[in-house]
Amino acid sequence: YEMSASLVGSEMCIRDSTLAVKVVGGPNLSLYLDIVKNGDALLSTDNLDYYEFRMEDPVNLDNRMQYVVSFRPRVSLMYALFIGKLYIDYERLSFTRAEFGLDMANRVKAVEAILHKKPVGLRFRPQEVAYLVTYKQQGTKTYLNYIRNVIRFKCDWKKRLFSSSYTAFSEMVVTDRTESPLSGISNKNTFKRKQVFYDLVDEYWNEDFWRNYNIIEPTESLENAVNKLRKQSN
């Protein structure tokens, strides 16, 4: 559960009446959501006992038939669980897609799973925490392809009549893949799962910061960025 909380955790601060939202996890956020590599995020042996699974009608995705398995909590725990669907390829029996979100039945548990800290007097009301993970076949294997995380919530101040709606959105797409021996990363250079990327990069808004790295600027749409990267690689 600790990992689940860190996936969607966020911090809030107020500057000049502007609400700033910081998502904890930075570059690691998407990698934690790879449910195949990180079974503890959803599919660990212990977690499976907490859910009720059901076979739904099969569907066709990209001209391939898929088993559809829906799941929802069958027990009540001290923390919020998930509701969603898993799509499994008929022939390969590998994951094609996972759609899941935080169970909002108990808003107190949902807040505990999402929010790390907020300003005094601010009321935080979660509306949705949704994830989408897709996988794509390359050769004889299926690899991670795309990850999206959406957090929708409302905030207002005590003694104020109206609330405001906000959305924190993050996504990752795999543009290219090469297989080569891995080299270890020193602990000093490792990005911790509870760190905030924005706080660690002093020149975050400096145009020269991004240079030629395979990184998408926060103000650029994912689709345009991917097309640009593909043109550069050709």
Which sequence ranges carry the predicted segments?
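Short, small-residue-biased leader/transition segments that mark boundaries at the very start
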Residues: 1-14
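Bulky hydrophobic/aromatic content
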Residues: 15-25
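Edge strands and adjacent loops of beta-rich recognition modules
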Residues: 26-58
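Gly/Pro-enriched, hydrophobic low-complexity segments
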Residues: 40-42, 53-56, 64-182
